[in-house]
């Protein structure tokens, strides 16, 4: 390198040395061009740090001294981008920046190289590329704006610039701190560039001539104002999100704070967002920061707030900024010094750039799109106007909500609650940032506290602000996404639609070409064809000729040399990559391997598979070279070599254990042609359960990106929908359901599904259901698995296309029984997916095909299993039942939607069905399908259902079925409680004629709930009044009930007429002795009320027993005896009442009073001195008002006989105790002071309605409560 001699020359800079030499006589008389050639040759040979010095001299020569040489030597300098030296690669980036600034047209050639360097593996190279892009983005935008006619190359160049800007924004998430810092500065510049300058924007002196959004005309043919404005706002949003990330580092946070301050000063329209971001950060400092870092961040935040406060546009936000500064410990005097004066605000001059912009603006386009106008921001408006447009933020809304709630009481409560969670010692981080609260309790301090709390709540996703924003943005968000996507389509087109270029391709001549229409050509990086050794002044040497030394070789030598040459080229991978000739090497290898034998191909394939990711370019080059050879051969060409290459690659990739990066998919999608054999490899890849999703994603992309053969690829995916492996099949069905939504594929998918469904009408499974390797000549029977194979796809599509249900019904009618059973088992879930309001499903119910009744019924059951039937569904089923198919099974699913009358009419038919079906019917009516009973939706409540069963005509249904049905009711103990059964018995007893199963129900109820004993006694007494003996079956049950309930039933038996009493003894003679003993335990006064005819029957076979004392009173005639009912326990009894019970009479009051008058003249029944005669005044008070029965309290288990007399005081406790013992009832807690009086009764004309007598009956719950006492007394 000629650098001159002497100290004076050595001390000069590289550039000054060079220019001095050039201005002088020159070294060896070299021209500038020759000098450049010489320096480049030196740089190619130098390996130490002096290479940078030489390259910088070249840069000075061709950029500053003689720019005409720039284009000539561009490729040679760019070749150094593959140099292993980091500094050299950084120099190349700097050279690209300077060259493009000198001649912007060079950006067309160099942008792809810069894009490659942006992805360099070295961090410092990437950082240098980001810094260069910060400048070149503005330069490129200005160039595009000035160009009124945009070429295709310019469009592609700008697309790549925009894509690189997007990539740099993504580097905000890089793992390297330095890269993130550089990305923040790039985003800052991007936001400033893609937003308009305003009247009060602060413009740094070095950026005065930089382009901004306001300099871009609205009618530019390619650059769209609105798109750039949206990109600028999106970049700001990304920066704000990055700043509030909880894991942000200290250096990144400091850089972001400065960038936001710069943005606020240069673009005041973003002042609101910046202040809010500062507030959020102040309230939520990242927890990962150390104590010293917290102090540093707070100091930076304070400095930037003060710088923003100086700006005139900060007037609107002075309250928020001041509060933040006070919290950060800023003195009021310092805040006052940094306040903008109102004079500056009023008299702030307009920037020169604004006036220049006015001159530059073109005439407005009268045909401008209204939609674009709506999106245009007002560049000349103030920050206040922009704030009004943007509306309140989440924090503002939440702060307004909290401010009135921050009363002294509420704040005191919050402090007290939070003290529970305070640590024992003050954290160091809190101590470092704590500043005393000034002006506590003032309106300003309360407002600040509300904003602090609102900021934290918003960061946590809480508060009314977040909720309102979500609601307001739901619909606009969808529209915004659509618009943004349409805006970005043009930019991303090249990236998505780029085709892999074929080396030496003749694809434009091939009719078999499958690729999509050619996308916009992207800029390609410069790759020098030869090594940087250039022919210059010293390059004139004798040309080496191969023919001079060529000697004939044997075939074996030739083969060995070929193999050796290929191996050497393969092994030279790293060396070639450092020299920048990697692409040349790939082309050589692809050409060699295509022309030679399979031995070389196996060697190259093995080399590729060793590191597929790094050598994928070689794989594609080889693949496309084979395809190009096939095309070049024309009509006589064969695909065998291409197919062999593709299958080898795919098979090798399939054997690789880890395919997470999707290389297999990339090879399939970018292969020029997918042959049948290759498609079979893809299919096997899909059948691998560990790679199912990736394989089917590949198939999906083939279907959508290669429309010429999409149905062939779709067929493979459809075949997989009936695969025997669950995971493979499920994944295929998911993909197919998404494709079914596409109109162009819908018909094919549907036809395939219906073809498989139609296979079910065959007597045996067709061979298509079996693999090709299985023998299907012998007819195999249908199995559940083969039936399901035909149904999987159809059932997956059914919820999306309800019309398909009619096809299933048609097939079902023709299928064999085994197939029908499987269909019924698998149809449930898809039918539920259709829903009972599906018009097609309702139509199927309405027009139920003959033979599909079971299918329709199953559908109805599936629909109504957990939800009540809809009115429309009930109407269709009702019409079907009444007009076409009177099969009561149709009604079962919609029972809860029918009228009560309809259910009662259908009951005789329903209970004659299979017991399992009957159980289902009762589960629906009682609401017990899923556990606890809930008949709220049933047309019949439990009581009405049981009554309806009793009322079924035995002609319509046999008694055995009715009894089984009632047993099902009694089995539901949770539903048929004692209260329900009491109401049922009361209503059945009131019916005329009495139901045949009445007494059976009474006995079952008493067995289930023994505490109903008292109530049952009342029922039996009422049945005597209804002359139960006239109903033979009921009478037989009556006697059995009396037999089972003795001795409680003795009081009822005594009410029977003599003839019927004798009949009872005839059927149950064992009742006579206990009943006689019971009567003899009465006092004489009580026995006086027993008619002689009754006593005669009682004593008919008991003459040997001592006769009871006759009552002095005259005997009652049989006709005078009226059946009496149990009376409820009276109001508090007199203390001397030894029996503790009262008489309740159901007949006329007048006749009862007459009986009392007959008994009064007798000696025994006459009152004694201590027993006053009964009188109206001595009677208990009127009975309590009739209320609903309450069985929650236990009552006495038995009652006294319906006929009894008063007793004297001195009768003694022993006799009374004996009477209680015989009745198994409790000893009364209080006895009457005088004789027992009779309760007034209503006349027959005012008998209580149905159920009222039950209300008078003692509570069964009360009986159970007093049972222990009764047992103790007995």
Swiss-Prot record:
* Main localization (coarse): cytoplasm
Look up the domain of life of the source. Eukaryota
Which sequence positions carry the modification called Phosphothreonine? 1257
- Residues of the region (Interaction with HSF1) are 1-124
Where in this protein would one find the motif Nuclear localization signal, according to its record?
345-360
Other notes: Could be used as a differentiation marker in the differential diagnosis of tumors.
The free-text domain note is:
The HEAT repeats have been determined based on 3D-structure analysis of the D.melanogaster ortholog and are not detected by sequence-based prediction programs.
UniProt-recorded name of the protein: Symplekin
């Amino acid at each position: 390198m000629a650098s001159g001699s002497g100290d004076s020359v050595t001390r000069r800079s590289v550039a000054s040395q060079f220019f001095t030499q050039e201005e002088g006589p020159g070294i060896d008389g070299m021209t500038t061009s020759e000098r450049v050639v010489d320096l480049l040759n030196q740089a190619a040979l130098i390996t130490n740090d002096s290479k940078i010095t030489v390259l910088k001299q070249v840069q000075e020569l061709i950029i500053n001294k003689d720019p005409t040489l720039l284009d000539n030597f561009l490729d040679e300098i760019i070749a150094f981008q593959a140099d292993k030296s980091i500094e050299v690669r950084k120099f190349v980036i700097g050279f690209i920046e300077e060259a493009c600034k000198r001649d912007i047209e060079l950006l067309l050639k160099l942008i792809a190289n810069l894009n490659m360097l942006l992805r360099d593996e070295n961090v410092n190279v990437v950082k240098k590329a980001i810094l260069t892009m910060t400048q070149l983005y503005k330069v490129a935008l200005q160039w595009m704006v000035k160009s009124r006619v945009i070429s295709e190359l310019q469009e592609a160049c700008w697309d790549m610039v925009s894509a690189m800007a997007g990539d740099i924004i993504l580097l905000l998430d890089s793992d390297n701190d330095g890269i993130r810092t550089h990305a923040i500065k790039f985003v800052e510049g991007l936001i400033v560039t893609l937003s308009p300058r305003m009247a009060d924007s602060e413009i740094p002196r070095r950026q005065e001539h930089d382009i901004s959004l306001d300099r871009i005309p609205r009618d530019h043919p390619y650059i769209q104002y609105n798109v750039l404005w949206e990109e600028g706002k999106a970049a700001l949003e990304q920066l704000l999100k990055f700043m509030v990330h909880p894991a942000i580092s200290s250096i990144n946070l400091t850089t972001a704070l400065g960038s936001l301050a710069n943005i606020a000063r240069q673009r005041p329209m973003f002042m609101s967002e910046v202040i809010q971001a500062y507030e959020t950060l102040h309230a939520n400092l990242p927890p990962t920061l150390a104590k010293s870092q917290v102090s540093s961040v707070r100091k930076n935040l304070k400095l930037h707030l003060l710088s923003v406060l100086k700006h005139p546009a900060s007037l609107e936000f002075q309250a928020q900024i001041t509060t933040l500064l006070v919290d950060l410990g800023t003195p009021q005097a310092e805040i006052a010094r940094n306040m903008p004066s109102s004079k500056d605000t009023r008299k702030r001059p307009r920037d020169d750039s604004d006036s220049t912009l006015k001159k530059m603006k073109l005439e407005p386009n009268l045909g401008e799109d209204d939609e674009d106008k709506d999106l245009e921001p007002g560049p000349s408006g103030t920050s206040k106007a922009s704030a009004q447009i943007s509306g309140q933020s989440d924090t503002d809304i939440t702060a307004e909500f909290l401010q009135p709630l921050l009363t002294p009481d509420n704040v005191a409560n919050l402090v007290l609650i939070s003290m529970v969670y305070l640590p024992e010692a003050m954290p160091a981080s809190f101590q470092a940032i704590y500043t005393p609260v000034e002006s506590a309790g003032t309106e300003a301090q309360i407002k600040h506290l509300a904003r602090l709390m609102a900021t934290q709540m918003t960061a946590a996703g809480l508060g009314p602000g977040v909720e309102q924003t979500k609601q307001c943005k739901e619909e606009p968000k969808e529209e915004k996404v659509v618009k943004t996507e349409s805006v970005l389509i043009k930019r991303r087109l090249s990236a998505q639609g780029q085709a892999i270029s074929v080396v030496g391709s003749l694809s434009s001549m091939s009719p078999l070409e499958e690729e999509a229409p050619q996308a916009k050509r992207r800029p390609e990086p410069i790759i020098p064809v030869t090594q940087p050794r250039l022919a210059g002044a010293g390059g004139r040497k004798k040309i080496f000729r191969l023919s001079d030394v060529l000697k004939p070789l044997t075939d074996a030598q030739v083969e060995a040399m070929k193999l050796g040459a290929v191996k050497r080229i393969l092994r030279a991978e790293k060396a070639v990559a450092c020299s920048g000739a990697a692409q040349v090497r790939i082309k050589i290898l692809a050409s060699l391997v295509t022309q030679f034998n399979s031995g070389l191909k196996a060697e190259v394939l093995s080399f590729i598979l060793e590191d597929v990711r790094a050598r994928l370019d070689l794989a594609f080059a080889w693949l496309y070279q084979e395809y190009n050879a096939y095309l070049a051969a024309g009509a006589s060409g064969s695909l065998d070599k291409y197919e062999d290459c593709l299958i080898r690659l795919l098979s090798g990739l399939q054997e690789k254990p880890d395919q997470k990066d999707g290389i297999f998919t990339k090879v399939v999608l970018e292969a020029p042609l997918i042959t049948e054999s290759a498609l079979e490899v893809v299919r096997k890849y899909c059948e691998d359960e560990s790679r199912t999703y990736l394989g089917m994603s590949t198939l999906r992309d083939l279907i959508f990106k290669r429309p010429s053969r999409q149905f062939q690829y779709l067929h493979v995916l459809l075949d997989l929908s009936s695969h025997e492996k669950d995971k493979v099949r499920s994944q295929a069905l998911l993909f197919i359901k998404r494709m079914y939504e596409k109109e162009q594929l819908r018909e094919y998918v549907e036809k395939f599904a219906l073809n498989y469904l139609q296979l079910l009408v065959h007597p045996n499974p067709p061979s298509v259901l079996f693999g090709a390797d299985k023998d299907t000549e012998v007819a195999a029977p249908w199995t559940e698995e083969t039936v399901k194979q035909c149904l999987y796809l159809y059932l997956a599509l059914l919820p999306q296309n309800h019309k398909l249900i009619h096809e299933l019904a048609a097939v079902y009618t023709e299928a064999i029984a085994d197939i029908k059973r499987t269909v019924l088992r698998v149809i449930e879930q898809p039918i539920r997916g259709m829903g009972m309001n599906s018009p097609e499903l309702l139509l199927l119910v309405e027009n139920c095909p003959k033979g599909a009744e079971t299918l329709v019924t199953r559908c109805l059951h599936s629909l109504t299993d957990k939800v009540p039937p809809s009115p429309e569904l009930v109407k269709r089923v009702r019409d079907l039942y009444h007009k076409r198919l009177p099969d009561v099974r149709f009604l079962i699913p919609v029972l809860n939607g029918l009228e009560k009358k309809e259910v009662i009419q259908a009951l005789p038919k329903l209970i004659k069905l299979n017991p399992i079906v009957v159980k289902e019917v009762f589960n629906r009516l009682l609401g017990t399908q899923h556990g606890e009973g809930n008949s709220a939706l049933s047309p019949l409540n439990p009581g009405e259902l049981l009554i309806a069963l009793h009322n079924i005509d035995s002609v319509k249904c046999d008694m055995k079925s009715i009894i089984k049905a009632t047993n099902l009711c009694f089995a539901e103990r949770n539903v048929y409680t004692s209260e329900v059964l009491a109401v049922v018995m009361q209503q059945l007893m009131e019916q005329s004629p009495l139901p045949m199963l009445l007494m059976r129900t009474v006995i079952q109820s008493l067995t289930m709930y023994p505490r109903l004993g008292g109530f049952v006694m009342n029922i039996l007494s009422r049945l005597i009044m209804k002359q139960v003996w006239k109903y033979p079956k009921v009478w037989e049950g009556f006697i059995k009930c009396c037999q089972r309930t003795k001795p409680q039933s003795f009081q009822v038996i005594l009410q029977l007429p003599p003839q019927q009493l004798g009949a009872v003894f005839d059927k149950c003679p064992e009742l006579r002795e206990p009943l006689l003993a019971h009567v003899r335990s009465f006092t004489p006064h009580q026995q006086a009320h027993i008619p002689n005819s009754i006593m005669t029957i009682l004593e008919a076979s008991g003459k040997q027993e001592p006769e009871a004392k006759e009552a002095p009173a005259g005997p009652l005639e049989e006709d005078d005896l009226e059946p009496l009912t149990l009376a409820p326990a009276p109001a508090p009894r007199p203390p001397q009442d030894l029996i503790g019970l009262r008489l309740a009479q159901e007949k006329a009051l007048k006749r009862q009073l007459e009986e009392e008058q007959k008994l009064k003249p007798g000696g025994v029944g006459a009152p004694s001195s201590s027993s006053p005669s009964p009188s109206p005044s001595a009677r208990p008070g009127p009975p309590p008002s009739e209320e609903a029965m309450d069985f929650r309290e236990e009552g006495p288990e038995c009652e006294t006989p319906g006929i009894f007399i008063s007793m004297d005081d001195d009768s003694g406790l022993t006799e009374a105790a004996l009477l209680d013992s015989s009745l198994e009832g409790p000893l009364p807690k209080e006895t009457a002071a005088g004789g027992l009086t009779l309760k007034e009764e209503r006349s027959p004309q005012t008998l209580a309605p149905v159920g009222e007598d039950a209300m008078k009956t003692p509570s069964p719950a009360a009986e159970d409560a007093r049972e222990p006492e009764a047992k103790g007394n007995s």
